[in-house]
């Protein structure tokens, strides 16, 4: 065993920096918190190279003297606290005195600052070493430039994901800061392009929140938000009604004392209030709460994202109840005009140009299928929703079918497949009834069509036989800037899946082509892209998993809906299609496609 030695200060600093600064988004978060703590009401942000080349934050806050400027990059130097007891009454974001020290250890850092009426000064620090201190223009405020992040820690640099992904995290930090600090105006540029411009509040809290939500969540969601307030915990929230749930779960924001936080307790409380929602639909919300610093703890980790409450059950119950009352009460959306992120498209019939590949020759359902919104809530007949599924850890499992009236759920390819069989009709326009030699067989027409479309799409995609349908007019889809970055990560793969997209602006994408196996209406296509942007947000997911999720979602939403009439020819064709499937007994989500009732069971039921 080697001898124990004390690490050099520069090595220890780089190791410690990894706890505070994990990626560019962590740097930006610390710089924005410092700017807000300094009393700034205008913050300008420039990002180049996804934050690896440059992160610049300029503010008009109180600024620093020369002495404070040189101390700002020294470890555990802070103006926020003086002793341990101060941790119980914090009203600032930063407090550890580690942020700038950690940033300086793994980058080339420069800080220019001046107090009102004082002289300006600039320091340069590289790899934790002070290079110079020099005069600078005496403009009140502070400008921090972080260049070549992780240049001296290649392992950390290698750990970073693609530029699109890192940019999406950076923009998420800005979105959170902008919602938390309505009195501050923000101007954000990435690689020279203006992405966000938020004007400072004129004192109208609701109006400012809705206007900022219009840029971040999208105008359509923002105008539907319900406003609710309660004196307890200084509670103010903006929630989508049950009729306006979204296909993604990342349009959710919690703030306590203006600090953005993640909390399973808070998230589960809100989801509990939305009980009965289809499991593939999620609320969008912005929740503000205030409470004494001693009643909650964010000092669990240097990132200060997770929170623990002194009275967790009380907070959970309060949030669940007040949200439930808002959803079931007479609350109305806030009546505020929202300027759309991009000019509205001209109203037109959604049409296709000539397809690039032949239309599929086998169309058992013809062209008269009702074209519903592909993300309309699934019928409750097809989905059993628990009171609450953890929105963070939930993974859909095959539903355990109920055995009602002695019916047997088919789980493997049985003799029930064998002919002859005769279509008798449908039950509630949802379940197809067939007579077989063994008895009765009931098929869930929605789940069956879902399975057929799922396998047909996968097969065509894997065999490179997927037909592409170019759109006569591109469809514009507005998204949060962070979601646009996520979606563009998968642009090339989406092309192989039949979807051709391109970025039109920092918050808008264009859809130029779709797979010809699906027939979209414009609204349906827009909602699909919004949902897709949420699903592909995590680049750690393998492309195979992404394919399955994408195909399952499309197949489910474009299958025959419950309550649709099916002719005898269509019913017979559907059964033939199911027999050709690798797994004709289950929908892609694991739910059963059919149940059977044998002649013997019928005889027993009638006591014969």
From Swiss-Prot:
- Kindly give the PROSITE patterns that the UniProt entry links to this protein: DNA_MISMATCH_REPAIR_1
**SMART domains, sorted:** DNA_mis_repair (SM01340), MutL_C (SM00853)
The Gene Ontology CC terms held by the record are:
mismatch repair complex
Q: Name one GO biological process term.
A: mismatch repair
**One function term, GO molecular function aspect:** mismatched DNA binding
* Superkingdom: Bacteria
- DNA damage is among the record's keywords: yes
Q: Which Pfam families would you find in this protein's record? A: DNA_mis_repair, HATPase_c_3, MutL_C
Alphabetically list the UniProt keywords.
DNA damage, DNA repair
Query: What family does this belong to?
Result: Belongs to the DNA mismatch repair MutL/HexB family.
Xref: PANTHER family: DNA MISMATCH REPAIR PROTEIN MLH, PMS, MUTL, DNA MISMATCH REPAIR PROTEIN MLH1
User: What does the function comment of this entry state?
Assistant: This protein is involved in the repair of mismatches in DNA. It is required for dam-dependent methyl-directed DNA mismatch repair. May act as a 'molecular matchmaker', a protein that promotes the formation of a stable complex between two or more DNA-binding proteins in an ATP-dependent manner without itself being part of a final effector complex.
Task: Give the protein name, as stated in the record.
Answer: DNA mismatch repair protein MutL
Q: Supply the source organism for this entry.
A: Elusimicrobium minutum (strain Pei191)
């Amino acid at each position: 065993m080697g001898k124990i030695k004390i690490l050099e200060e520069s090595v220890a600093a780089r190791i410690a920096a990894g706890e505070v600064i994990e990626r560019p988004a962590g740097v930006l978060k610390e710089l924005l918190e410092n700017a807000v703590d300094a009393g700034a009401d205008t913050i300008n942000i420039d990002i180049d190279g996804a934050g690896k080349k440059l992160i610049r934050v300029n503010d008009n806050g109180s600024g620093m003297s020369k002495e404070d400027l040189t101390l700002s990059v020294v470890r555990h130097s802070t103006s926020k606290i003086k002793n341990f007891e101060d941790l119980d009454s914090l009203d600032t974001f930063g407090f550890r005195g580690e942020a700038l020290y950690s940033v300086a250890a793994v980058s080339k850092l420069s800080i220019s600052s001046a107090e009102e009426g004082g002289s300006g000064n600039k320091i340069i620090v590289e790899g934790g070493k002070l290079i110079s201190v020099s005069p600078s223009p005496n403009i009140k405020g502070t400008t921090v430039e972080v260049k070549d992040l992780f240049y001296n820690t290649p392992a950390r640099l290698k750990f970073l994901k693609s530029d699109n992904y890192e940019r999406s995290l950076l923009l998420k930090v800005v979105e959170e800061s902008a919602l938390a600090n309505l009195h501050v105006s923000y101007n954000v540029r990435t690689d020279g392009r203006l992405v966000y411009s938020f004007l400072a509040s004129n004192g109208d809290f609701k109006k400012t929140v809705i206007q900022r939500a219009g840029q971040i969540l999208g105008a359509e969601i923002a105008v539907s938000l319900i406003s609710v307030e309660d004196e307890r915990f200084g509670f103010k929230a903006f929630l989508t009604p049950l009729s306006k749930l979204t296909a993604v779960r990342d349009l959710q924001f919690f703030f306590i004392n203006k600090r953005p936080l993640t909390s399973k307790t808070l998230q589960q409380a809100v989801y509990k209030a939305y009980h009965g929602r289809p499991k593939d639909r999620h609320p969008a919300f912005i929740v503000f709460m205030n409470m004494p610093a001693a009643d909650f703890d964010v000092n669990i980790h240097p990132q200060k994202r997770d929170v623990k409450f002194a009275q967790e059950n009380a907070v959970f119950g309060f949030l669940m109840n007040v949200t439930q009352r808002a959803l079931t009460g007479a609350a109305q959306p806030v009546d505020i005009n929202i300027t759309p992120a991009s000019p509205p498209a001209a109203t037109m019939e959604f049409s296709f140009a000539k397809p690039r590949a032949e239309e599929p020759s086998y169309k058992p359902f013809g062209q008269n299928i009702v074209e519903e919104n592909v993300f309309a809530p699934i019928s409750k007949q097809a989905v059993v929703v628990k009171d609450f599924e953890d929105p963070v850890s939930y993974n859909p499992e095959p539903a355990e079918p109920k055995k009602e009236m002695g019916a047997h759920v088919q789980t493997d390819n049985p003799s029930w497949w064998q002919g002859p069989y005769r279509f008798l009709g449908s039950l509630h326009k949802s379940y197809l009834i067939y007579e077989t030699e063994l008895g009765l067989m009931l098929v869930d027409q929605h789940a069956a069509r879902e399975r057929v479309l799922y396998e047909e799409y996968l097969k065509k995609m894997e065999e490179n036989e997927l037909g592409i349908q170019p759109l006569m007019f591109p469809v514009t889809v507005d998204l949060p800037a962070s979601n646009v970055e996520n979606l563009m990560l998968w642009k090339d793969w989406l092309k192989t899946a039949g979807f051709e997209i391109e970025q039109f602006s920092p918050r808008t994408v264009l859809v130029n082509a779709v797979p010809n196996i699906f027939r979209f209406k414009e609204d349906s296509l827009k909602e699909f892209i919004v949902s897709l942007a949420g699903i592909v947000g995590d680049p750690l997911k393998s492309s195979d998993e992404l394919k399955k999720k994408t195909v399952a979602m499309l197949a489910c939403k474009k299958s025959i809906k419950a309550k649709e009439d099916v002719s005898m020819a269509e019913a017979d064709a559907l059964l033939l299609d199911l027999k050709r499937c690798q797994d004709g007994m289950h929908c892609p989500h694991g739910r059963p496609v059919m149940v059977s009732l044998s002649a013997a069971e019928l005889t027993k039921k009638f006591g014969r």
